[in-house]
């Protein structure tokens, strides 16, 4: 079977990028699929994740990001020009490859793909929640996105909660959780270190500013504890400077390939995301024996964390409750260890060998109908 994924670039450290690489690697290694990924902005950058040599990476050399060098008017003109060029090159590649299935994770690709794909099944991977925007412009954009997404042969969501919303616009919605890198050693956190951990991209979605604000209150009660944040993104420098200026025992790190060591050397994992379709890092942390404190953001955390058993789910933006639960764990080593043990057991629900057969089944269903 010949599969084409479409994505902007694999050059960044990020959850979507890692998941795409993992899935493509699995499809070529275990199922013998012929897999391509077509990018618009990869350029000469290499992926920080190990992409199997059998996966064909084709970059269309568009460089959408370069338009931001111009003023607003010129930026709009450049975007239209680049979009036309992108669609022309994308159509040419699809005609040459002649895939069995096309998969996209970005909404702006759906409409042009529907026009150029012919009878090929189109799969839309939803790595963002079906959000309910609060501005007129966003509501209009959401309606447009939903209209075109609803015409795809399949929409794949990460959680049942997200799927319920998508079923308002499509009858072809499937739930397939993300693949997760779980701790596959016998080494776990003993929950005795005075370290709290966050891992994620430094962007608005992760709501890191609120986490830092919560930590200010925690630090007054537990000044000998440390908050470690690992990740990258456009807000990294901003939060690095903010954390350094506050001087409240926060250390901000760039991504590392040895992230499992960071999990095992910590005692509590925290997440304050505004929305989290799945939350890869939650089961990762749990598999290393960490209890998790997370906002109950739509829709991922509640599908992974059992509140009061292996972690705590906090109502959105209740900073006081969030801080109280973190302090509760910091002040009770036995509770940390008990919840950590249960977290290890809970993490086993998302093993990779349960996920990829679901994709294989979907692909076979779609190709049998085309």
Short names for language-model regions:
Residues 274:
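Aromatic "clamp/platform" in nucleotide-sugar-dependent glycosyltransferases that forms part
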Residues 306-308, 312-320, 328-333:
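Conserved acidic donor-binding segment of nucleotide-sugar-dependent glycosyltransferases
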């Amino acid at each position: 079977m010949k599969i084409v994924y479409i994505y902007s670039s694999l050059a960044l450290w990020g959850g979507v990028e890692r998941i795409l690489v993992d899935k493509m690697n699995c499809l070529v290694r275990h199922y013998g699929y012929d897999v391509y990924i077509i990018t618009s902005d990869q350029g000469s950058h290499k992926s920080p994740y190990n992409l199997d040599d059998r996966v064909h990476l084709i970059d269309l050399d568009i460089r959408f990001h370069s338009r931001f060098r111009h003023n607003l008017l010129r930026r709009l003109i450049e975007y239209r020009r680049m979009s036309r060029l992108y669609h022309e090159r994308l159509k040419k590649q699809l005609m040459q490859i002649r895939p069995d299935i096309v998969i996209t994770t970005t909404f702006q690709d759906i409409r042009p793909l529907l026009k150029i794909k012919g009878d090929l099944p189109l799969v839309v991977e939803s790595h963002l929640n079906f959000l309910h925007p609060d501005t007129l412009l966003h509501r209009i954009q959401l309606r447009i996105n939903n209209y075109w997404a609803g015409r795809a042969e399949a929409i794949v969501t990460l959680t049942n909660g997200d799927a319920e919303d998508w079923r308002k616009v499509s009858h072809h919605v499937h739930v397939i959780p993300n693949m997760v890198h779980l701790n596959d050693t016998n080494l776990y956190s003993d929950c005795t270190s005075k370290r709290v951990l966050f891992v994620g991209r430094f962007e608005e979605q992760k709501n890191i500013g609120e986490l830092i604000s919560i930590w200010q209150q925690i630090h007054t009660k537990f000044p000998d504890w440390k908050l470690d944040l690992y990740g990258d993104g456009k807000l990294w420098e901003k939060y690095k400077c903010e954390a350094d200026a506050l001087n409240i025992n926060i250390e901000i790190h760039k991504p590392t390939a040895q992230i499992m060591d960071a999990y095992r050397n910590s005692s509590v994992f925290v997440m304050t995301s505004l929305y989290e379709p799945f939350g890869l890092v939650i089961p990762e942390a749990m598999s290393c024996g960490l209890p998790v404190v997370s906002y109950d953001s739509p829709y991922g955390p509640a599908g992974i964390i059992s509140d009061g058993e292996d972690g705590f789910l906090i109502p959105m933006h209740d900073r006081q409750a969030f801080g109280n639960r973190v302090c509760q764990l910091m002040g009770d080593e036995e509770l940390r260890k008990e919840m950590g043990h249960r977290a290890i057991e809970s993490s086993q629900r998302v093993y990779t060998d349960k996920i990829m057969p679901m994709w294989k089944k979907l692909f076979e269903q779609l190709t049998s109908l085309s």
